Amino acid sequence: MEKKPLVVVNGLVRKDAIAYLKEHVDVRQWTEKTVMPREVLKEWLIDADGLWCVRPLDVDSDLVKNAPNLKVIAQAAVGYDNVNIDELTAAGIPYGNTPGVLNETVAELAFTLIATASRRILENANFVKEGRWAQRPSNIKGFDLSRRTLGIIGMGAIGVSISRRARAFGMTVVYHNRNQRIDDKIHKTTYMELDDLLATSDVVCVMAPLTDETYHMCDETFFKKMKNTALFVNVGRGPIVDTDALINALKTGEIDYAALDVTDPEPLPANHPLLDVENCLIVPHIGSYTDRTRYDMSILTADNIIAGVHKKPLKTCVNEEVNYKKPQMDVESALEELKKAGVDLTDCD
């Protein structure tokens, strides 16, 4: 019997995805609840054909330099700020992520945060639980979303999905990107320079990826340019925000409220000062955390790995230049396949 390719999984993932993976490859998985030591992982990779990357893990040339059989690395995530794509490309290793699968789910969470924060749902619910129904102060009254302006920073597919929900609530949507989209009329959105967006928006939602350019983009100067009545939402990446600057902006009234799915650091230590800020709602990075979406992400990751270890094209490859190519079919083989499919070629010139 032909030996199956070996895939290393450096952490805990869905059991159904592992079962699916094992139908096609041999799996060696780190099943401890602790983070797998990097040196141990490097030893495991010596004989591996594929790696299912589980955060936290920095993927670079150092990790894969002694893995001569490694043909693919994949991760159940859209973002890949923990992966050095240039170094993997130089090593000829395709990297697969999971775009498209989670767009609607993350957009739902982003707009849930916007709606929850705008009406101070958490604070008002707590007043009821505490038996203080009639004592809630006026500063948690909230505001309407209709006739307000939502500014989206990072208008990719998820941003477009958020904008669709915002318009259904009667909001005007503006956005800032590295480049203006060509489909503004279709989505009824307006491109703005960043400073104009900050000055105009009642809600600022960050959806940008983490890059050298976006690291700490939301700093002291950024928050000073926002309305002091504005709501700030981050569903992108934690390090895009200077956490100290955000804390100061919330405490001094430079902005009114923040709702965060991501933080820096992440997870937040129990004694972190951001947790003491009353006008800040934090959830533990649950943007894609629904059962169906996590399943779809896991299966797509498994499919990318299965394809890669067999040197077949990954469905979703970031560094497409080193993705495996479909073999070219010669004319005779193509005609034979058409005949097998029942195509009548007798009338073809």
Protein language model regions, located:
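N-terminal glycine-/charge-rich "phosphate-binding" loop or analogous flexible N-terminal tail
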Residues: 1-48, 170, 325-329, 333-334, ...
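Rossmann-like dinucleotide/phosphate-binding beta-alpha-beta segment
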Residues: 138-228, 336-349
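Short, well-ordered coil/turn residues at beta-beta hairpins
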Residues: 10, 54, 76, 207-210, ...
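Rossmann-like dinucleotide-binding domain for NAD(H)/NADP(H)
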Residues: 95, 172, 220, 229-349
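Phosphate-binding beta-alpha-beta segment of Rossmann-like dinucleotide-binding domains, i.e.
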Residues: 99-149, 161-164, 183, 313-320
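Phosphate/diphosphate ligand-binding glycine-rich loop within oxidoreductases
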Residues: 49-129
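Short beta->alpha connector loops at strand-helix junctions that form conserved
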Residues: 30-33, 76-77, 93-104, 177, ...
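Rossmann-like adenosine-cofactor binding region
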Residues: 46, 59-63, 178-273
